[in-house]
Regions:
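Tandem repeat scaffolds
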Residues: 2-211
Length: 211
């Protein structure tokens, strides 16, 4: 699986996030936003293009139907942000807090989540293609009725995550950890797991193993 990284210009203009509130259309492009804090904000279908965010805080904000292309978030707090029906392409989240962040019905393609907190994140009914989760906390994350294609979980914490009505065929969970998952036998067909995880799945599915 090859993930296309963000195509971000090496020459970005420094801007304050507040400029987006003064635009006729809420668009940020070709810019760098550093250290800004705008919590509990509302933006009507915002669009971020070719932009980098560093040490920004947007907790409890409503960014529903946001469009992001060629964007990088580093050390940002996006906890409880609403990104319902978002379109997120060629984007990176690095060392970010996405606790309880909502991505229902989103389209997420060529996206990397690295060293980030996504406990209680909601991705129900999302289309997720060419996406990697690396060293992420995803406990109690909700992947209900998602469409996965080229999705990887590398050394993640997945305890009590939900995958109901989401096929894990071709997904490699072998380097990740969990005690229990909310999943059925149909969803785990074709999933790649470690020997220990195979025993865990057998227990989750009600099988009794005799030695």
């Amino acid at each position: 699986m090859k993930i296309i990284p963000p195509k971000i210009s090496p020459k970005l203009m420094n801007k304050d996030f507040s400029t987006i509130f003064h635009e006729e259309d809420p668009i940020l492009e070709m810019c760098q936003i550093s250290g800004d804090e705008y919590t509990d904000s509302f933006l009507d279908r915002p669009r971020f293009y070719n932009t980098e965010f560093d040490h920004c805080h947007f907790t409890n904000s409503d960014f529903s139907q946001i469009e992001m292309v060629d964007v990088r978030f580093k050390n940002c707090d996006l906890a409880n942000v609403d990104m319902t029906k978002a379109a997120i392409h060629r984007t990176e989240f690095i060392n970010c807090k996405l606790l309880g962040t909502a991505f229902p019905e989103a389209t997420i393609k060529n996206v990397s989540f690295k060293d980030s907190l996504l406990n209680l994140a909601s991705l129900g009914d999302a289309k997720i293609e060419n996406v990697q989760f690396v060293h992420c906390l995803l406990e109690n994350a909700d992947f209900y009725h998602c469409k996965f294609k080229g999705v990887s979980f590398d050394q993640c914490e997945l305890n009590e995550a939900t995958f109901h009505q989401t096929s894990l065929k071709g997904v490699d969970l072998s380097t990740s950890k969990f005690e229990t998952l909310s999943i059925s036998i149909e969803e785990v067909k074709g999933c790649q797991v470690s020997t220990y995880q195979a025993l865990q799945f057998s227990s989750l599915l009600g099988l009794i193993i005799k030695e």
